[in-house]
Structures are given as structure tokens and as C-alpha cells.
Amino acid sequence: MLNGIVVVNKPRGVTSSDCVYKLRKILQIRKIGHAGTLDPEVNGVLPIAIGQATKLIELMHEKPKSYIGSGMFGKATDSYDLDGTTTAEEKIVTPFTSDEIISGMKKLTGKIDQVPPIYSAVRVNGKRLYEYARENIPVERPKRKVNIYSYELTQDPEYDPLEKTESFNFAIRCSKGTYVRSLVNDLGEELGVPAVMTSLTRTSSSGFDLSQAVDLETIEKEIDYPEKWLQPIDSFFVDLPQLQISPDQFKRVSNGASIKLNTTYAKVALVYNGHIKAIYQRQGKIYRPEMMLLKNE
């Protein structure tokens, strides 16, 4: 049985669930799930856990995500991207300088309260926001605390003198739960003009980046060579201290027993026969199991 993480390079025009469904059919595997939904028109890194790696999904969500994208000043939509209905338009007579845009981005960096787009999957009273939007039912969107580690302008903005709009490119590194569409909309609000996101690519997620991503067609062609497209479970724990355990210790670990270890780390990955078999956490003078990965081969 395969165990590991497939870093899929999701194309535009398909949902994250579509990718999971297609990969399930290709691999003929039932234990499978993705970590972090991408909107249909967003492409890039979509980590999909299979086999024992599905135990990691919650941990995978906790790691920062990175994006590159583009936006435009002069127009706003109800979805904060080009799929939505236009809600505001304003001719940009005097284009913003790079410094002005960077200043606005800095105000949106750090720990902030973010309001999600009305067209999003956030639940309010058991119902998703996009369902309220489609039914034209007013609803208060809850603010959510997110961490924007960096929000950067990646090149000088471009002004269109005919359309009187201004386009800009950005790079963002952020915590889970962040809506990049909202950050583009909020940047417009900081500068006092409508703004809309025009494209977005996720460049990293769950500790994996685009250089490790493969498309589903490649996986289908290379189905017999998983080493070409499957990231081992151990690769997810590269930042965690690892400790080799003896056969006797492994017997105890296999039974979920607490053990004493010659280390003081708060959390440690236990390795046996070259693979991580469990994650143990220190409690007082002993270590107790936090996650069992006994089938990780």
C-alpha cells in the first residue's frame, strides 16, 4: 500500500475535490485527502495525502502557504476576483507609485482580522457564505484572525492609459485560513480605490513547493514509479528531531506504550528500520504517543 504525499500541480478550471477524485481513480486507493482547498481558477501546489499520510492532514494545514498573483486597481467584484459581478468601477487618473502600493501592503502585514469574501466556503450558522450569496440572503461575515508573514510588490505596477486601470503583481506568505482575494480587495480599500484579484498561483503549502509538484497526467504515465512523484511521510517531518529506537523499544511503541528516551526534546520522531514509526511527546520524564505511523514503509 502506498503511503505518502502527492504534491499535485493543480491546473486552473478544476476543483481540489476533482483532483482527489481523479487521483483516487488513478491509484485505486480509498484513504486519500487534500490539505488546503484551492479555488477552481487558482493553480499551483495542492498536497494530497494517501494511506497513512492522511493522519498528517491537520498538521499539513498548520504550515504557512505562499502565493504569487496579480491584481488591478479600478474595478471591484462581489467575489473579489474576475469570476464575480462588478460592484464598483473607478478610473485611475493618477496611477499609484510602487512606494504607495508597498505602504498599503505593509498595513496588511502581520496578525490581522480578515473578513472573508461573501463567495467563500466559510460557514455561518451551518451554512456556507456562498449559499447566502446565491440566495441573496444578508449575512454578517465573521472576522477571522490570520497571520500575513509577508505581502510584497514583485515588480513596478503597470498603468493602462486607455482603460485607466493599474495592474500590479504580488507575493504573499500567510497562515491557514487566509483569503488572498480579500487581501487584494483590502489593499484597494487602503488606497481608496476599487481593486480585484486577476490571477493567483500557490507556490508552496504544507512544506512543499512547485519544484516538487507534478500533474495528474504524469502520475498516470509513471504509475509504476512512485519514487518519481510520491513524497515520503518522513519528508514532512524534516524539522522535527529524529531518534533511532531499538527493537525492544519498537515493540513497546507498537503497542502504544509510553517510553523513556535519552533526550529532552518536547516532541520527537521515532525511527525504526529507516522510517518514522511514531511521533512522541514529552510529558514529565516520559514520552507518550501523539501519532502512530506503524505502516510507514
From Swiss-Prot:
It catalyses: uridine(55) in tRNA = pseudouridine(55) in tRNA. Its EC number is 5.4.99.25. The keyword Isomerase applies. It holds the Pfam family TruB_C_2. Keywords: Isomerase, tRNA processing. The active site is at 39 (nucleophile). The keyword Isomerase applies. GO terms for molecular function: RNA binding; tRNA pseudouridine(55) synthase activity. Coiled coil: none annotated. NCBIfam families: TruB (TIGR00431). Responsible for synthesis of pseudouridine from uracil-55 in the psi GC loop of transfer RNAs. Belongs to the pseudouridine synthase TruB family. Type 1 subfamily. This is tRNA pseudouridine synthase B. The lineage of its organism: Bacteria, Bacillati, Bacillota, Bacilli, Lactobacillales.
